[in-house]
């Protein structure tokens, strides 16, 4: 699992598919999916999206870059899906997060 975590951290801004990660690890795609979900409790794609959203969260706080620029930098091109997942994870919108962060400085 450590190898998978490292791979996702290093490549989160790139397109990561089940095919390329399972191939990289020399595993069958279906076996990889089952193994990952059994160990992590979530699907591999959900995990990749969480890693991306965590990186985006940090950039929203520590940079003044535009939201779309940040999301694309970290491999998230579907803005509607990003906003939905971000709000589920952090219970606020990216703009609200920035406002809160700027008020606490």
Question: Can you say where each PLM-predicted feature lies in the sequence?
Answer:
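Non-catalytic C-terminal interaction regions
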Residues: 88-92, 98-100
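The DNA-contacting recognition helix of HTH DNA-binding domains
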Residues: 29-30, 34, 78-80
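Helix-turn-helix
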Residues: 22-27
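Terminal helix-turn-helix DNA-binding modules in bacterial transcription factors
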Residues: 5-10, 15-19, 38-84, 99-105
